[in-house]
């Protein structure tokens, strides 16, 4: 860590829970962010600002006018430009001292496994169940911590899932790939609610990477109308085909 790094990250280095050792861990880490929408854009901003050494930004979509209500990396001038490229540009302006990789593609199959294998933490910021299940399967197979979130209307949810998956995985809670009837596309979403959830994904990643204990194996539910939180303990599903021990499918 050089003098420039020390000055840039000084406000979090002052924290006893992070300090120089924790900051160096962040600088040495790689985070994969899949999905650069209402969750992924605030998460990416805070992780870049915090000095996570390598960020891999994956999204195959372009910026649309309807995105601008909540996807805070983008401006009106970015409409029809690839989200991953715009994100790379903006985050480079914020922090040119970190490594940024833009993947203008939908990560599936071997490409997904390869990206997950290189990451210390994966942020699932996607918006469909099939992709979430595929990300979860790859993370469990490769023992990579997964931080997943979603939001619709005034509500959000967040989970931190870590090896050895004693509290289960995403598949344990949602055993199929069918999207819920109520989601961002059908029910709408309040911008700050999805921003809260994406920001919390970044916070949990910083805690994991810097060695701060974080509550894993919980489903955390946020009600934006009442500003209240609820936490539900997760349980490993018997015979889960992804993490269910001897009953798991081979990968």
Task: Outline where the language-model segments fall.
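Adenine nucleotide-associated cytosolic modules
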Residues: 1-251
